[in-house]
């Protein structure tokens, strides 16, 4: 009987892993389709937008149709928009994101160079958000009617309403120019204590992107709901640790859901923060590429951003399936 029970547990775990594996494969296939759709939409928008990437190469000259045609022919670029899209798609399928029209450098290399800076910024800001939101949410869930809980919640909402760019300029003026607490340099200047400079954009993005208030509100509501469930009341009556029973549904799942849902907004805020702080990340590179009509760079960054958002959604699905394997089949 003991061996039979152990075998049943092993079979159940294998079935759960199999369901999670099927879910991951399904999500990866969906990600490929979504990236294809994003690439098509972005390419069409760039094609319909005013300006011409070939005008960048003809800067200082009269960019007539003949000049554009000669440049297009020299670069081997198809004349139709769908021909250019299919050519780009074929190159991307082989891992080639093209070459920057402005610099002549491969787009993949530029993304690899600037990508870690944006990754540090986004992950660091999420850490700041959680360090602020989680304690306030836990305290507010436990002391819903307390004056301090209400004051903390109000303060979070007020801070989250501050525009990112405004807070960034205020922080630069106050902590760099007036108080001199942080160095006046950027990630492109690897001087002593330059790591201090990254703290300012991380804190600004983590505080003023609206995520703090959303995470606080969602965690407080979910914790309040879970704490009124019958199994929590039963655990409390038996003297069992309530937090251990409420952790998954009241904390882990809501927090994972909010992080995945707010990832696009964090990336959007990173574009503004990188511009304000002169931070050499993908957001600043995307703005420069938009000004230069550097379509290959814009397409490459759009693909990386879409893949990053989908990765956050995939991790959310894996965590959900790990907590409750039945969700992997839904």
What are these regions (language model features)?
Residues 35-83, 179-198:
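Hydrophobic alpha-helical transmembrane segments of membrane transport/permease proteins
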């Amino acid at each position: 009987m003991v061996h039979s029970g152990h075998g049943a547990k092993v079979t159940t775990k294998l079935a759960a892993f199999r369901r999670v594996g099927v879910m991951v494969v399904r999500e990866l296939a969906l990600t490929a389709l979504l990236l294809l759709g994003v690439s098509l939409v972005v390419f069409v928008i760039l094609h319909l937008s005013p300006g011409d990437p070939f005008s960048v190469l003809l800067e200082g000259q009269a960019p007539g149709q003949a000049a554009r045609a000669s440049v297009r022919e020299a670069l081997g670029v198809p004349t139709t928009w769908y021909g250019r899209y299919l050519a780009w798609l074929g190159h991307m399928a082989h891992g080639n994101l093209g070459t920057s029209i402005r610099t002549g450098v491969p787009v993949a290399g530029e993304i690899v160079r600037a990508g870690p800076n944006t990754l540090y910024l986004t992950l660091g800001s999420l850490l700041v958000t959680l360090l602020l939101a989680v304690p306030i949410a836990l305290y507010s869930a436990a002391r819903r009617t307390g004056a301090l809980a209400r004051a903390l919640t109000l303060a979070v909402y007020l801070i989250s309403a501050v525009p990112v760019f405004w807070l960034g300029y205020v922080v630069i003026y106050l902590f760099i120019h007036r108080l001199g607490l942080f160095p006046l340099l950027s990630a492109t200047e690897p001087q002593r204590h330059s790591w201090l400079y990254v703290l300012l954009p991380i804190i600004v993005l983590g505080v003023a992107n609206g995520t703090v208030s959303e995470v606080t509100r969602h965690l407080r509501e979910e914790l309040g709901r879970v704490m009124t469930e019958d199994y929590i009341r039963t655990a409390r009556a038996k003297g069992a640790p309530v937090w251990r029973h409420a952790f998954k549904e009241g904390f882990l799942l809501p927090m994972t859901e909010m992080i995945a849902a707010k990832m696009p907004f964090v990336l959007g805020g990173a574009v503004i923060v990188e511009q304000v702080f002169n931070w050499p990340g993908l957001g600043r590179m995307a703005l420069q590429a938009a000004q230069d009509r550097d379509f290959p760079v814009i397409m490459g960054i759009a693909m990386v951003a879409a893949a990053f958002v989908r990765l956050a959604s995939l991790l959310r699905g894996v965590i959900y399936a790990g907590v409750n394997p039945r969700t992997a089949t839904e």
